[in-house]
Amino acid sequence: MSRRSTPKKRIIDSDPIYRSRLVTMLISHILKEGKKSLAQKIFYQAMKNIEEKTEKDPLKVLQQAVLNATPLVEVKARRLGGSTYQVPREVKAERGTALALRWLLSSARQRPGRNMVAKLTNEIVDAANETGNAIRKREETHRMAEANKAFSHYRF
């Protein structure tokens, strides 16, 4: 890998139905084995279910869920003199959103049941209401950063 220049950022197109980049990112995360049409079907059905369940705009519910699940700080391992420290650091907006989407999906996949649409619907609604595993994961990350605040002077 070349060390000369940083790679260019990928430009993410907005999806055709909701005109949102966030939706495109989530569909890409749902994607398994290149089956994008199946991922889109799962997501759009989940959005319909969210609308029926909450009687609110599903895009607003999704945005609120992602906002609630987005971490502000994280810990990163830093090796110094034979011991490894968990150093807290702020999370940039893009990485925070990506982490929130990843946590939402992994929490949805861990839920009991076979229907991914129902699992994703419930996880998004729970995250919008500040409950659920994705929110628990964010709080756990914040607790780790708080516990290791003493090492915050170690920079990268």
Curated annotation (Swiss-Prot):
Disulfide linkage: none
GO biological process, one term: translation
This protein's UniProt keywords: Chloroplast, Plastid, Ribonucleoprotein, Ribosomal protein, RNA-binding, rRNA-binding
Subcellular location: Plastid, Chloroplast
Entries under CDD domains matching the protein: uS7_Chloroplast
Cellular component, GO, one term: small ribosomal subunit
InterPro entries: Ribosomal_uS7, Ribosomal_uS7_bac/org-type, Ribosomal_uS7_CS, Ribosomal_uS7_dom, Ribosomal_uS7_dom_sf
Main location: plastid
MF terms (GO), sorted A to Z: rRNA binding; structural constituent of ribosome
Subunit structure: Part of the 30S ribosomal subunit.
The family this protein is said to belong to: Belongs to the universal ribosomal protein uS7 family.
Record's function text: One of the primary rRNA binding proteins, it binds directly to 16S rRNA where it nucleates assembly of the head domain of the 30S subunit.
Name of the molecule in the record: Small ribosomal subunit protein uS7c
Species this protein is from: Mesostigma viride (Green alga)
Organism lineage string: Eukaryota, Viridiplantae, Streptophyta, Mesostigmatophyceae, Mesostigmatales
